[in-house]
């Protein structure tokens, strides 16, 4: 498991979550290929993830970064934390994320931490249950962040004021 921080000119924070080597056995021996899982974000609520496959590690990482930039979503944050507690699942991975007070930091492990860091969340309590496969944890985290809505957006959809909703 690797963990890199890189800044690009576009202002995106890129993190490498996982590199995995797989082997295909053929008549002449084994063919090794690599898969990379990366997350990309601007630190202000835009975040994306991608997977890339190649015979070389750098090429797999590059493909994953490009896929992550194409697969970006906007997350409605409440300052530096989440709007409300979120439960989400993908496959056998289940994640729970809850807003935290200022100064708490990111209390999350592994793949979930990488997603929350690049999304711009600075105060959160998070826990992963079930499978801790990084691919499924990232998917579950994204599902949860994608479903989260701010009170302003809910009020606008219902045609009411924020005070009526809260």
Curated annotation (Swiss-Prot):
Domain S5 DRBM: 12-75
Keywords: Ribonucleoprotein, Ribosomal protein, RNA-binding, rRNA-binding
Keyword Coiled coil: no
Gene Ontology annotations for the cellular component aspect, listed alphabetically: small ribosomal subunit
Gene Ontology molecular function terms on file: rRNA binding; structural constituent of ribosome
GO biological process: translation
Gene3D superfamilies from the UniProt entry: 3.30.160.20, 3.30.230.10
Stored InterPro entries: Ribosomal_Su5_D2-typ_SF, Ribosomal_uS5, Ribosomal_uS5_bac-type, Ribosomal_uS5_C, Ribosomal_uS5_N, Ribosomal_uS5_N_CS, Ribsml_uS5_D2-typ_fold_subgr
Superkingdom field: Bacteria
Pfam families noted in UniProt: Ribosomal_S5, Ribosomal_S5_C
Subunit comment: Part of the 30S ribosomal subunit. Contacts proteins S4 and S8.
Domain notes: The N-terminal domain interacts with the head of the 30S subunit; the C-terminal domain interacts with the body and contacts protein S4. The interaction surface between S4 and S5 is involved in control of translational fidelity.
Classification via NCBIfam families: rpsE_bact
Family: Belongs to the universal ribosomal protein uS5 family.
HAMAP family named among the record's database cross-references: Ribosomal_uS5_B
Name of the protein this chain belongs to: Small ribosomal subunit protein uS5
Source organism (scientific name): Ectopseudomonas mendocina (strain ymp) (Pseudomonas mendocina)
